[in-house]
């Protein structure tokens, strides 16, 4: 009897551990899907029109061109994509953002570009995590009608590399966004 009880409890514990582990590793289907396209390590498809990644290399730009990406929105503060994209048909856009001091106005201006360029579009910064994550979270709220909570959850937990210990300012900015005001400024509310 004691042996059976021990076996039963052991089985029960293993079952609970397995279930809790598998539930914690399930990625919501609405979150961006990782794309395996060398040389990228942080390339995701947000929706049929928008992708996100780290800084593309020259090889990366060619791969994006072959994938059918039409436009690139760089959020890099210093570097441009001109040299890397030289031998492609990609349309290059740049909106320079400093990660430490990103403002609501910069988010809206970046979204305005993203909404109006030829699609599909890739949004990137250096690592594809902080500035890119902020703009994609705002895109989720303004264009895809996500709740603020869901957009921030994906931003923080999506595996894109958000540096929360350094850039809490981005979380504060996203928390303060008035979604209806942002939609109105972008012409998304009639």
PLM segments and residue spans:
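Bacterial N-terminal signal peptides that target proteins for export
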Residues: 1-9
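Bacterial N-terminal signal peptides
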Residues: 8-20
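Cys-dependent protein tyrosine phosphatase-like superfamily
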Residues: 20-121, 134-190
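Short cysteine clusters
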Residues: 125
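Substrate/cofactor-recognition hotspot
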Residues: 128
């Amino acid at each position: 009897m004691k042996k059976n009880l021990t076996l039963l409890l052991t089985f029960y514990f293993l079952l609970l551990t397995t279930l809790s582990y598998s539930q914690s590793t399930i990625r919501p289907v609405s979150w961006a899907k990782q794309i395996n396209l060398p040389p990228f390590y942080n390339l995701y498809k947000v929706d049929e029109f928008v992708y996100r990644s780290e800084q593309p290399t020259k090889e990366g730009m060619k791969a994006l061109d072959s994938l059918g990406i039409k436009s690139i929105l760089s959020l890099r503060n210093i570097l441009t994509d001109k040299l890397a994209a030289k031998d492609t048909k990609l349309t290059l856009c740049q909106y320079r953002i400093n990660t430490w001091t990103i403002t609501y106005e910069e988010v809206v201006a970046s979204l305005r570009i993203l909404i109006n360029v030829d699609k599909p579009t890739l949004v990137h910064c250096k690592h594809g995590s902080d500035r890119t994550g902020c703009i994609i979270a705002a895109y989720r709220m303004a264009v895809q009608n996500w709740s603020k909570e869901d957009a921030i959850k994906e931003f923080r937990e999506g595996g894109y590399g958000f540096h929360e210990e350094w850039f809490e300012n981005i979380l504060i900015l996203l928390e303060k966004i008035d979604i209806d005001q942002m939609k109105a400024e972008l012409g998304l509310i009639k």
